[in-house]
Amino acid sequence: MKTILSSETMDIPDGVAIKVNAKVIEVEGPRGKLTRDFKHLNLDFQLIKDQVTGKRQLKIDSWFGSRKTSASIRTALSHVDNLIAGVTQGFLYRMRFVYAHFPINASIDGNNKSIEIRNFLGEKKVRKVEMLDGVKIVRSEKVKDEIILEGNDIELVSRSCALINQKCHVKKKDIRKFLDGIYVSEKGKIAVEE
């Protein structure tokens, strides 16, 4: 069954500028600027002003859409919400080194843009992981064997974490027993709202 019109709106917070140009959304805030392309979705994006409250809103419409198209409205809203959170607060992921015997040594270099992992399972091989654009990596001062990744784009930060995690993949051993690696321990935002 096709629905004639499905639409949802979301409020745009103060201090955030949004531009919509042919399904390309550009969000600008205190932490910087992010853009996202929604050309693959059959949706209409509009910037409107609420009649009652006078707040700026982003309205997403889907005309004559199936259930999947209607579901993509909520997905697009979530992506825009992540863009707004990124330019206002930023995203922070914490990763912990897990090892049973051989301590993992990691050195951060290249102006906080890459990490070199040594002594993983006692191997001599040096694993180097470059961070994606806009992602900064630092060592935690408070907690031993912890690194912190931060950036504005949640997808780039989480993909950088995945790259680090995949470099420390245990091969030719039972992964239920050999749990060594670098794992994400905490996800959050840099600037916490009061």
From Swiss-Prot:
Modified residues (Phosphothreonine): T75
One Pfam family it belongs to: Ribosomal_L6
Molecular function terms from GO: mRNA binding; rRNA binding; structural constituent of ribosome
InterPro entries (alphabetical): Ribosomal_uL6-like (IPR000702), Ribosomal_uL6-like_a/b-dom_sf (IPR036789), Ribosomal_uL6_a/b-dom (IPR020040), Ribosomal_uL6_CS2 (IPR002359)
Gene3D superfamilies: Ribosomal protein L6, alpha-beta domain (3.90.930.12)
Source organism, top-level taxon: Eukaryota
Keyword Ribonucleoprotein in record: yes
Keywords: Phosphoprotein, Ribonucleoprotein, Ribosomal protein
Keyword Membrane appears in the UniProt entry: no
GO process terms (BP): translation
Any one GO cellular component localisation term in the record: cytosol
Protein family per UniProt: Belongs to the universal ribosomal protein uL6 family.
PANTHER family per record: 60S/50S RIBOSOMAL PROTEIN L6/L9 (PTHR11655), LARGE RIBOSOMAL SUBUNIT PROTEIN UL6X (PTHR11655:SF43)
Record's protein name: Large ribosomal subunit protein uL6x
Source organism of this protein record: Arabidopsis thaliana
Gene name linked to the record: RPL9D
